Structure formats: structure tokens, C-alpha cells
Amino acid sequence: MITIKKGLDIPISGAPEQVIYEAPAVHHVALLGEEFPGLKPTMLVKVGDHVKKGQPLFENKKNPGVIFTAPASGLVTEIHRGHQRVFQALVIAQDPTIGAVSFQRYQDEELPQLSREQVQQQLLNSGMWTALRTRPYSKSPVPGSVPKAIFVTAMDTNPLAASAELIIEQQPVAFVNGLTLLSRLTDGKVYVCKGENSLPHSHVANVEERVFTGPHPAGLAGTHIHFTEPASAKKTLWHINYQDVIAIGHLFASGELYNERIVSLAGPGVSAPRLVRTQLGACLSELTRNQLLAGEQRIISGSVLSGNKAAEVHDYLGRFHLQVSVLPEGREKVFLGWIMPGQDKFSVTRSFMGHLSNVKRLVFTTAKNGSERAMVPIGNYEKIMPLDILPTLLLRDLAAGDTDSAQQLGCLELDEEDLALCTFVCPGKTEYGPLLRKCLTKIELEG
């Protein structure tokens, strides 16, 4: 067992009831480009085409062979592009009568005998290959490549997250089958990183469990990788979340793409926080209709720490997101608020009286409580960073664009979500995730 001592569990109100409900039906789904850094799609469909679930929509020309398939059957209604024609979203109006693409089916006892090439090809053909991400760089793996190890994130310590154990218990056979299939993709270990609760266990020799406890970010893939088998420029690892492992198990058992998602619909802006059963890429404005409290609310695909604002062309559940978080827009001005004791406010530095209050959960809003300013190294980053790195020095190098020093300080191990807590506690209001991505892109291109 690895116990994480540094970190932070944010006392945010609106925690979900850990019971799974059926979500309202959604009529539109989409694939979003922002989740795949450097994506350059070669389109295989156009607006007005009818597509089956699992049908190829586009291929990544920067990573040939990586196919993105339709998460549902229906009509392609929109293809959005942004500045310099950067791909943003492909939207499908659902029509279940069109049907689905069929893939090869296997019996459970056949899975351990499948070759690496068979497993890879089925994942590529179905689009499930995109569920895998590399460290470093957090990109889809190159087809034919072999990782040193694969990490399965079977826990979630994000604020307002769903219980991974509860969801895995719904599909134990598919989860174990998914682990068996992942074990065929590497000569190293498949690490199932989990909390203290028991999970369905795989008997494949190279599948091992690792137990992590402690505050957030104890449940992040970056934390698991750092304390188990760190990544580097010469050592590539893959990671995947537990619901995608279940989806892989279903794909090989049924021969059909499985895009069900159980997500946490929660936060201070939700009237009845709970777990809901929906689908990958679901339209969030449709999913949250009549589910929110009065007032202006911000819908976030993902965690309140590292998720994306769901609005306009981005109004859809992200490929890797297992949460829909809702926060009130913090536009109200408080008269003389800067000198108030702040009994209803949270502060890592205990600048407010909130830490003396009996209120255990606080209503957080989107307000940053101040404009951007210079980095102030007062020890905040060190309080919440459990990884064996020097956070203040690393963040300074990211802000300065010093890629050589950032590499020496461990930036190749990290993803945007690993620095989300640093952004939250930063007195200077700096967003470190985009700075890290800019640095990683430069390193990948220039070394």
C-alpha cells in the first residue's frame, strides 16, 4: 500500500448520491478534438452522411492508423473548426434505427490466447485504441508500439467523483476480460491502481494490484506512475481508466462498440447530485436540462479542477471524463469583500475564518477572487504536491518556457490534471495546465 500524505480534498458541496440512476435521453453526441493534443484529422465522412455506431469518422494523419469511430448511429449534423481550421467537434444527431458496425466476437476462454496483433487490430478498427494514453505526452499510442507497462486507474479522488468500486461491481466479468486483453499488449506489468476496497481480480500472471490511499491526487494516473514505474523520454507507459477497460471487455465479448458511461452529475449547482447512466460524448445541455438550481450555472465536463467548460461547440461529455460538474457563476460583487472574515470561504493558507466554521462543505463558484499576478512562492505548491519533484522551480520554468530545466525537474511525467491542484492553490491565479502542454509540445517537436 502506498499512502499519499500531501494533497488536498476540497470541501465542496453537492457530493453525489452513490446510486446509479438512468439519465435523461440525449439526442446529440460528439467527438471533441481538444482532448487529443496535436490531432490532425483526415475526414472520412461529411455533414449530411448517415453513420453506424462504430463506423470510422476520421483518421489522425499525425498518427496513421489511429481511427476515431462514431459513438452512436445517426446523422452527421455539424463539423466544427476553429482558428486555422483546428478541428473542434463532430456532432451526430442520434438515430438508433441505423444500426451498428459488427466486430469479431470471442468467448471468454479465448481471450488469453489472442495474439498482440489481434488485440491491437480490433482496438484500432473499433476506435477503442483512443482510450489508451501515453506517458510522456498523453497522446494516443503509435500503432504497433509496445509499452513498458500499462496502468489502469481503478479509483477516483477528484472532487465530487463517482465510486469506481460501485461501477466496476456492475460489470465484473467485462472488467476482468478487459484486463486480460490489456495484458496482451505489453511484455511488462498491467498495474490495477485502486483504493482499499476489493475489486474483481484477474488471474493473468502480469496483472498486479497497487493500493493507494490518501487525499487527491492519490487517484490520478500520474501519481500511480510516479510511485510505481516512472515514465521518461526513453520509457513510454500507457494508462487507461476503469470504464474504458470495461468497454474493451464488452467489445471483444459482444462484437459491438460499448459506449455507456456512468458519470457523476454533481456540484453546488445541481438540484439532485447523483450518478447517472449516459453515453460517451453526450450533449451536456440536454443531459442537465431541468437538473440545475436557479441562477447562472457553469457546466463542466470533467472535474472542477481540470475539466473543460461545456458550452457552444464544446457542449459534450469528454472522451476521458467521468464527471459532469456544475458550479454557480461567481459574478456577484461583495461590498468590502476583501476585508470580510470569510466564514463561508475556503483557503489553503487559512486566510479566512472558514476553517473555524462548523460547515463541512462550502459552496464554491467560478470566481477567481482576484486578477492574475506574479507567482508568489509561499509554500502552497509544496503542501499539495505528493510527487518527488520541486514544484515551485518546475512551475517557474513552465511559465518561463525553459524546457531543458523543466525536463530535468520531471515535466515529462506529468499531464495537465497533475498540476490542477497547483493552479487551485496558486496565489497568482496562474493556469499551469496550458503552460505544461505548451512545454510538452515544444519538447516533442524540438527535443
Swiss-Prot record:
GO terms for molecular function: oxidoreductase activity, acting on NAD(P)H, quinone or similar compound as acceptor. It catalyses: a ubiquinone + n Na(+)(in) + NADH + H(+) = a ubiquinol + n Na(+)(out) + NAD(+). Keywords: Ion transport, NAD, Sodium, Sodium transport, Translocase, Transport, Ubiquinone. InterPro entries: NqrA (IPR008703), NQRA_2nd (IPR056148), NqrA_C_domain (IPR022615), NQRA_N (IPR056147), Single_hybrid_motif (IPR011053). Its EC number is 7.2.1.1. It holds the Pfam family NQRA_N. One of its GO terms (biological process) is sodium ion transport. Belongs to the NqrA family. Composed of six subunits; NqrA, NqrB, NqrC, NqrD, NqrE and NqrF. This is Na(+)-translocating NADH-quinone reductase subunit A. The lineage of its organism: Bacteria, Pseudomonadati, Pseudomonadota, Gammaproteobacteria, Aeromonadales.
